[in-house]
Design a protein with these regions (language model features):
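Hydrophobic anchor residue at the start of the ABC signature
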Residues: 155
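ABC ATPase NBD coupling module
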Residues: 69-91
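Conserved catalytic motifs of ABC-family nucleotide-binding domains
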Residues: 162
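Conserved ABC ATPase "signature" region
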Residues: 121-137
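Catalytic Walker B motif of ABC-type/P-loop ATPase nucleotide-binding domains
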Residues: 166-169
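Conserved ABC ATPase signature
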Residues: 141-151
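Short coil-to-helix segment of the ABC ATPase nucleotide-binding domain corresponding to the Q-loop/switch region
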Residues: 103-110
Length: 230
């Protein structure tokens, strides 16, 4: 599970800064949350803070997992500890997929496990590869895949090491409506199977509502935005 309270950052200088704030967010195991809002409202900025990439200016509480409190490590910007947490506890899925072009699909998928010293294969991973119909594509390179195939491969890579939290930045942005719905259905199924949490940035409110994601929407307030649970 993940619990965050009092997270905020101001981008820009003091006179023309834009403040992005998250008063509270809680996601249980098996639960998916969505960050929505207008372009420029700070969705990606917030995801970078939650992903331990961007240091917040303010933070009251940050719990990652059942009993791992990382508030002080985040505020102190302890890079070695944060890098270890990112590698072990978080999985990232980018708009473009983010697959390394010089690695095959299988090598891309196995990369997070190898970096953590895990065996490259697991029974669960083999099941997921078959379930997402990626087995015939494992020896191909990303350039040889369709957009939908790349996103499926990127999703499996993001959760191959069974992280506590999956973070996905507009994972359906390049997909047509049919493939977008299919990808979200796969994310829902796999998140429940792994009993992890997930947080997605999405511009598609209809899909967020259709799948019943917990919904945190950016409300513009003065010189900034506040993400409030709907």
């Amino acid at each position: 599970m993940i619990q965050i309270d009092g997270m905020a950052i101001t981008r820009g200088d003091a006179q023309h800064g834009f403040r992005v704030a998250l008063p509270s967010l809680t996601l249980e195991k098996g639960e998916i949350g969505a960050l929505t809002g207008l372009s420029g409202s700070g969705k990606s900025t917030l995801l970078e803070m939650i992903g331990l990439i961007l240091r917040p200016d303010e933070l009251t509480h940050f719990q990652l997992g059942d009993d791992l409190i990382i508030t002080q490590a985040v505020l102190s910007n302890e890079q070695a500890q944060l890098a270890s947490l990112r590698a072990e506890k978080l999985g990232f899925m980018l708009q473009s997929g983010g697959l390394l072009p010089f690695l095959t699909v299988m090598q891309n998928i196995q990369l997070p496990r190898k970096m953590l010293g895990l065996t490259p294969h697991s029974a669960w991973l083999d099941h997921a590869i078959d379930h997402l119909q990626l087995r015939p594509l494992l020896s191909r390179f990303p350039r040889q895949l369709s957009i939908g195939e790349r996103q499926r491969a990127a999703f499996i890579r993001a959760i191959a090491h069974e992280p506590a939290l999956l973070l996905a930045d507009e994972p359906t942005a390049a997909l047509d409506p049919h493939n977008a719905q299919a990808l979200y259905a796969l994310i829902v199924e796999m998140v429940k199977q792994l009993d992890i949490s997930a947080l997605v940035v999405s511009h598609d409110w209809s899909l967020v509502e259709r799948f019943g994601f917990s919904h945190y929407h950016a409300q513009l307030q003065g010189d900034g935005s506040v993400f409030i649970k709907q």
